[in-house]
Amino acid sequence: MNMEIRHLGRVDYLPTYEAMQAFTLERTAATPNSLWICEHPPVYTQGLAGKIEHVLNPGDIPVVQTNRGGQVTYHGPGQVVAYPLIDLKQAGYYVKEYVYRIEEAVIRTLSHFGVTGHRVPGAPGIYVRLDDPFSHARLRPSPQPSPKGRGSSTPVLLPPLPGEGGGGGGPDPDPFHSLGKIAALGIKVSRHCTYHGVALNVAMDLEPFSRINPCGYAGLKTVDLRTIGVSVTWQEAADVLGQKLSSYLAP
């Protein structure tokens, strides 16, 4: 499966969204898969599950309704945004595995810079430990209310196993208190073809995240590589993420 990587630079969100839709609508079985890598001026985007009450105080930052999955997120300068435009039928895997592969590419990108990324069941995206983002400490799922009030698995940091210097852990009343979100994911699949994608925070002004409930979670902390002590340029992060996505999305 060949994949063309296109570096778009800094581009407005809405025309990029419209271009993704057009690309997907017009593509045929002969259309090569493509990976668009870009950066957006400040914008909030709402997913299909988004609720207006999660947009707390947008101010002068526009809010764009989209057809991707998920809830509200923020895009802005200093964030690498990657849009894989993939024919899953050609790729030979289904949506669940597609999401897993995107997350794995982000985890491997973070690992390249010495950071340990974590998945959180029921909360798509990638998270890091705020107390030690370079630690390999495990996370254990624990049933907690989801943003919609249903049960879901959210993380509790595990101390060492017996014999490793510690005891067991219990449910945390604030399961995200020790975690920060460093990458957000939201996709759309139309006629087995994907668009939208993933955003990795590199060196941003993080203040706009405080004006929303990111991904529908009130108080969820958002971090970037700079905040956790990793000095890397946008282009360096974009190049590594592009390479990892190209590799992990291959059949």
From Swiss-Prot:
Site (Lowers pKa of active site Cys) residue list: 181
Domain BPL/LPL catalytic: start-end pairs: 29-251
Subcellular location: Cytoplasm
Enzymatic reactions: octanoyl-[ACP] + L-lysyl-[protein] = N(6)-octanoyl-L-lysyl-[protein] + holo-[ACP] + H(+)
The protein's annotated pathway: Protein modification; protein lipoylation via endogenous pathway; protein N(6)-(lipoyl)lysine from octanoyl-[acyl-carrier-protein]: step 1/2
Enzyme class: transferase
Primary location recorded for the protein, binned into one broad class: cytoplasm
UniProt cross-references to InterPro entries, sorted A to Z: aa-tRNA-synth_II/BPL/LPL (IPR045864), BPL_LPL_catalytic (IPR004143), Octanoyltransferase (IPR000544), Octanoyltransferase_CS (IPR020605)
A single Gene Ontology CC term: cytoplasm
Any one Gene Ontology molecular-function term assigned to this protein's record: lipoyl(octanoyl) transferase activity
Record: active site: 215 (acyl-thioester intermediate)
Record key words, sorted: Acyltransferase, Cytoplasm, Transferase
A single GO BP: protein modification process
Enzyme Commission number(s) from the entry: 2.3.1.181
NCBIfam families per UniProt: lipB (TIGR00214)
Stated name of the protein: Octanoyltransferase
Biological source species: Polaromonas sp. (strain JS666 / ATCC BAA-500)
